[in-house]
Amino acid sequence: MVNKPNPKAYRPEDYPYERGLAFLLRDNYRYFSRHLKIHLERHGSSLPQWYFLRVLAGQDGLSQKELSDRVGVLAPGTVTALNKLQSKGWVERQPHPSDKRKSNVYLTKKGRRLVRSLLPEAIKSNNIALEILTEEQMEQLRELLILLRAGMKKKSIDGDFP
């Protein structure tokens, strides 16, 4: 069981930044993304754009709102990203069948080809971790991260989390 710190007794020397969970997650994200970023840039894409392409590759035809939620980007950021993706010919928007005010987003053939060509590099980035952790440890880590995300999301929605 992890001891919860006493907020009245916080001292920086007792809580080194490099042991902080958010710091560790961010630092690992940087290492994972650095490898993929090089390959994305060669194809004229970026990490933020890749997230949208990757989500759509898993489930095409999502609304902009659904995409925002899944990628974790606010609506204005989603609109900007989709405009760029559309200008590159990687996605297209089609009117929602029952609500003409909304649109659904689809990968184009060109977008699908891009995802297929970049997916091996994304998998390589993930597999680097398998050189460090066993498959069992990787699965445990995934499960813990999923649990953490769900808990953090719930706290955020409930207003208990800034």
PLM regions and their residue ranges:
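N-terminal leader segment of winged-helix/HTH proteins
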Residues: 1-43
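Short capping segments at the starts of secondary-structure elements
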Residues: 59-63
